[in-house]
Amino acid sequence: MRINMDNWSREIIEAKDRRYLPVLYFPCVPLTEYTVAETIHDGKKMAQAMKASIDRFPEMIGAMTGMDLAVDTECFGAKVRFPENAVPAVEHAVIEKADEVADLQVPDAHSGRVDIFLDAVVEAEKLITDRPTFGGQLGPFSLAANIMQMDKAMMAVITNKAEMHQLVEKATEFLIERAKAYKEIGANGIFLAEPTAGILSPKMAAEFSDQYVKRIVDAVQDEYFYVILHDCGSVTKMTEGMYGTGAKGFHFGNAVDMGVICEKMPQDVLVFGNLAPADLYSKGPDEIKAMTAELLEKTRQYPHFVLSTGCDVPPEVKLENIDAMIEALNEFNQTV
């Protein structure tokens, strides 16, 4: 469905009340008759899980595909484990040494399971017609780190800079084409997950992440296609570089103070965050409600803040805790 996303964003910022967009695809899968593994191998089943999440939480401002971030690495040849009701995980890196980068082939943007996620967007837009639909994919440095293995990639940015740039370049080339594929089939935007960049220093993040993210944003973002950049690391000192990518939405994890982040991020973009998935898993509804109320109070003066989780929520999280989060939001909105 074609939506002017600049208007969508502006309406959220100008609204009196606060909105919410938690990343909770996986806990909503049990609302269908399918397992997690079934939904990430079948676009129609994934779309039904997306619709189930909207039916369960009807005020969410958008719908998202499953945050299966193994998809991109799998396209490059990684071995992926698929538990029946857990998030897929990369078991083995594709390359182990920097000198292997030159021979690494960039896969077609429709290889692996990519088209399942494209099918999910197409099918979801038949079921969800009143709000945007977002696809999900990794960011360039995070994909590069998955391909090489994180600890080796973190060393390579120091000891093998040329090869690491070549690897991030190949990741970016693939991710641009994948983002274009989402845009071509009618998605309203992407959730670009770049968590591994949060481990880098601000200088290294600018060199190995921000400039490549900007290329993805420049290739696809316009008034009808919206990029939300996610980094759940300790990125308080990286906000200028993140904003410089040109993305129009920024999603933060619980490693940062959202009051500080909202102050640093200009109010012409949306800022999402940041209840910890671990807390949503381990704590009860009363605690979650209190934590949400505290977060909302901390961000009260920032109209560009959107309540969310700090990252994707594991399948085991009880939906009663999401209910508690929304209950706190509804009570807060009565005071604004």
What kind of feature is each model-predicted range?
Residues 46-66, 181-188, 244-247:
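Catalytic domains of carbohydrate-active enzymes, especially glycoside hydrolases
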Residues 34-45:
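Surface-exposed strand-loop-strand hairpins of Gram-negative outer-membrane beta-barrel proteins
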Residues 29-31, 62-64, 71-83, 143-144:
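Short active-site-adjacent helix-start/loop capping segments
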Residues 70-107, 130:
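A contiguous, low-structure linker/loop signature
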Residues 23-26, 49, 65-70:
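Acidic/polar N-terminal loop/beta-strand segments that form early-domain functional surfaces
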Residues 1-29, 36-37, 106-336:
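Active-site loop segments of alpha/beta catalytic cores
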